[in-house]
């Protein structure tokens, strides 16, 4: 018989990955990059969260403050993953490869969250500190039946190209071996190379980090398609959704690729 914790984790994972795949809206950009990246008309988190929920995302990954402010909008409609680590871009340059605690697994449970997320900068001079914190987070989440999503980002003074397939695959493998239930990481530029990242993760779902807004929505849809063709578990997207001209159309197009197997050309027709 499986444990109560295993049941809880499976139930929550089924909300995050309804068919084994997921379109997750990432919205931790205010603390990470400042409000300047968010269009002024979308600065109110209640307005933006309502729009992405109605657009049809499967889950939201955000900070505890935004989860608390918008609970009545997302509750019972989408899965909620709360990020418990963070940093600002205005902290000293020497500390840019370190994330600090901004919440706890217990607060995630208190807020009604379905999952917990935290970053590890693999290769950073602070890797030891971040890995120690990740382990505490994961073990507490395991005890309470919450899936743990690791933002597995290779970054550090000795990493020349953080998007190189060998580096990204290393980070994905390290995330799997340190107990991640879901892995968010960089796109490596091609289906073939990202397939190596997926393989390195040993069966743990690998979701592409959306990154900066692409020059065109069509270009981003090609990335999404490439990830899914490589066996990825979906995408975690922020700027390519909240900076889009039409949020609902963009989410609809991404969903069509992730859940319905549309190719980029067919999905692009949904953009209007």
Swiss-Prot record:
Coiled coil: none annotated. Its EC number is 4.1.2.13. One of its GO terms (molecular function) is fructose-bisphosphate aldolase activity. Keywords: Cytoplasm, Glycolysis, Lyase, Schiff base. CDD domains: DhnA (cd00958). The active site is at 184 (schiff-base intermediate with dihydroxyacetone-p). Transmembrane segments: none annotated. One of its GO terms (biological process) is glycolytic process. It is an enzyme of class 4 (lyase). It catalyses: beta-D-fructose 1,6-bisphosphate = D-glyceraldehyde 3-phosphate + dihydroxyacetone phosphate. The keyword Metal-binding does not apply. It comes from the Archaea. SUPFAM superfamilies: Aldolase. SMART domains: DeoC. One of its GO terms (cellular component) is cytoplasm. It is found in: Cytoplasm. Activated by citrate. Its main location: cytoplasm. InterPro entries: Aldolase_TIM (IPR013785), DeoC/FbaB/LacD_aldolase (IPR002915), DeoC/FbaB_aldolase (IPR050456), FBA_class_1 (IPR053414), FbaB-like (IPR041720). PANTHER family: 3-HYDROXY-5-PHOSPHONOOXYPENTANE-2,4-DIONE THIOLASE (PTHR47916:SF1), FRUCTOSE-BISPHOSPHATE ALDOLASE CLASS 1 (PTHR47916). Homooligomer. Belongs to the DeoC/FbaB aldolase family. This is Probable fructose-bisphosphate aldolase class 1. It comes from Aeropyrum pernix (strain ATCC 700893 / DSM 11879 / JCM 9820 / NBRC 100138 / K1).
